From Swiss-Prot:
Entries under InterPro entries matching the protein: ATPase_OSCP/d_CS, ATPase_OSCP/dsu
Membrane topology designation: Peripheral membrane protein
Family per similarity comment: Belongs to the ATPase delta chain family.
Localization (cell): Cell membrane
Subunit composition and interactions: F-type ATPases have 2 components, F(1) - the catalytic core - and F(0) - the membrane proton channel. F(1) has five subunits: alpha(3), beta(3), gamma(1), delta(1), epsilon(1). F(0) has three main subunits: a(1), b(2) and c(10-14). The alpha and beta chains form an alternating ring which encloses part of the gamma chain. F(1) is attached to F(0) by a central stalk formed by the gamma and epsilon chains, while a peripheral stalk is formed by the delta and b chains.
Lineage: Bacteria, Bacillati, Actinomycetota, Actinomycetes, Micrococcales
PROSITE patterns membership: ATPASE_DELTA
Organism: Pseudarthrobacter chlorophenolicus (strain ATCC 700700 / DSM 12829 / CIP 107037 / JCM 12360 / KCTC 9906 / NCIMB 13794 / A6)
Function in brief: F(1)F(0) ATP synthase produces ATP from ADP in the presence of a proton or sodium gradient. F-type ATPases consist of two structural domains, F(1) containing the extramembraneous catalytic core and F(0) containing the membrane proton channel, linked together by a central stalk and a peripheral stalk. During catalysis, ATP synthesis in the catalytic domain of F(1) is coupled via a rotary mechanism of the central stalk subunits to proton translocation.
UniProt KW keywords: ATP synthesis, Cell membrane, CF(1), Hydrogen ion transport, Ion transport, Membrane, Transport
GO CC annotation terms, alphabetical: plasma membrane; proton-transporting ATP synthase complex
Protein name from the UniProt record: ATP synthase subunit delta
GO molecular function: proton-transporting ATP synthase activity, rotational mechanism
Record flagged with keyword Iron: no
Record has Protein biosynthesis as a keyword: no
Length: 275
């Protein structure tokens, strides 16, 4: 998303920020529901991107469609998006998805207590999303089931819950959305996007590190320090053990993939891990 759509999303996120301290998962579910309505109606998408309609008309149209069906906050957020300028119909859907996910992430962030393991609600959410994707990656049968176009959303949601039964309510909302309404991409890729939004919320990136064998605590600390220095910021590091990996180590940060063959960037990390 770029240009006018990016500006509209930034404006919407800024407006949403005022609602986040008291927002609940219900608001997120309502926004995801409105997203489903937009995605399922080509006529509505055309109306929302029709250059001959002004912003007030588009906003009023959406408020009329959702009025009485969702909360006032959800209607306000959706109406505000509709009244903004978008380069494409896809962009307004992506924006709704981002706002809904941001609400879920904020609910996790606002949890006052930490879990028994000592991690925050936001960290718990990230870990739960990562665990789901690992569970899917480990089973070709599950991957086929989640991508089966004839399977119902309810069946896919039930399967997801069986894969990771102990996840937080926040993670459950995002995972359910990803498997029932992936919007043309793999469910696991959408879960990754949600995890990236969660990491961005706490001003960190996610580094998925694949290694041939488990790291010791010392090696993990060195890896964390090396990656932080390499990127100039604190990263959230997830470790994936893959005995079949060629090269010893593979690091992915966002869309950037670094293999051990990139000696100029990972050579120092390899030396640190060998120490």
């Amino acid at each position: 998303m770029a240009g006018v759509s990016s500006e509209s999303l930034a404006t919407a996120l800024a407006a949403l920020e005022a609602k986040l301290p008291t927002a609940s998962l219900q608001l997120a579910k309502e926004l995801f529901g409105i997203l489903g309505m937009v995605d399922s109606s080509a006529g509505l998408r055309r109306a929302l991107t029709d250059p001959s309609r002004n912003g007030d008309e588009k906003s009023a149209l959406v408020r009329q469609l959702v009025g009485g069906k969702v909360s006032a906050d959800a209607a306000e957020v959706a109406g505000g998006l509709a009244g903004s300028r978008w380069a494409s119909a896809r962009d307004i859907g992506d924006a709704l998805e981002t706002l809904a996910a941001t609400v879920v992430i904020s609910v996790a962030e606002n949890k006052s207590a930490v879990s028994a393991s000592g991690i925050t609600g936001l960290e718990e959410l990230e870990n739960d999303l990562f665990s789901f994707n690992q569970a899917v990656a480990s089973s070709h049968e599950v991957q086929r089931a989640l991508s089966e176009p004839q399977a119902s959303g309810a069946a896919k949601a039930a399967l997801a819950e069986k894969l990771v039964p102990g996840v937080s309510e926040e993670a459950k909302v995002l995972i359910t959305q990803a498997v029932t309404q992936p919007r043309g991409i793999k469910a696991t890729r959408l879960v990754e996007r949600f995890a990236e939004l969660a990491a961005k919320r706490q001003q960190r990136w996610i580094a998925t590190v694949s290694v041939t064998r488990p790291l010791t605590s010392t090696q993990l600390s060195r890896l964390q320090a090396g990656l932080n220095a390499l990127y100039g910021r604190e990263l959230k590091v997830n470790i994936n053990v893959d005995p079949a990996l060629i090269g010893g180590i593979r690091v992915q940060v966002g869309d950037e993939v670094l293999d051990a063959s990139v000696i100029s960037r990972l050579g120092e990390l390899q030396r640190q891990l060998a120490g």
